[in-house]
Amino acid sequence: MSRYDSITQTLIIQHHCGFSDISKEIKKVEFECLNPLYNWMIKLSNNITHLTFTCCFDKPVSQLPSSIKYLDVGKHFNQSVEGLPDSLTHLILGYNFNQPIKEGSLPSSLTHLILGYNFNQPIKEGSLPSSLTHLILGFIFNQPVSESCLPNSITHLEFGWCFNHPVANLPSSITHLKFTYGYQLNIENLPLDLEEIVIPRNKENLIKIPFNCKVIFI
């Protein structure tokens, strides 16, 4: 069974259906609460640009259509991310994902990356592509982060609740930075071109804010 959401222009697949029935005009597909067979993905049209799995999906992603630009693998996915299409710009790795990200495994086209709730792997130098501009680190993440492991392309960086490492010498390209209530350390040596920072209210006297930077207290 499937239905078409005209507002989001997305085909939502709730039960098995033949992919020959999917119009080539469809560019956005969402699998809702099912575990599609691996060969289903091979049959997906190269016209599809947006692919979402809401839950239950936990299969390799090495044979997705080369046209995919946006991929949300859902909350159950916990597989290697090697072999993603070179066209991909947005990747959401959901709640269960906690796999090492190897150097060169993410496509060089990627600009937006969300690492989900359980991700807590070291970010090694070269593991994030030089195209990346937006990075959100999930709730559990508590690994050291430094200028050497983040590409100079990053402009937006968000830390999760458990993160509690020093953040000195972040890339100078960062313009937007967010911390949560869980951060217990002093915040210093911020990028000079920072435009906006979100910090806990108890940190307002413990940080040196660059000139003209907007501060949002939470």
Labelled PLM ranges:
Residues 89, 93-96, 105-118, 127-137, ...:
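Intrinsic low-complexity, intrinsically disordered segments enriched in polar/basic residues
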Residues 11-18, 29-39, 50-59, 70-79, ...:
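Concave beta-strand-loop units of leucine-rich repeat
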Residues 1-5, 16-24, 37-45, 58-65, ...:
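Short, T/G/N/S-enriched strand-turn elements that build extracellular solenoid repeat scaffolds
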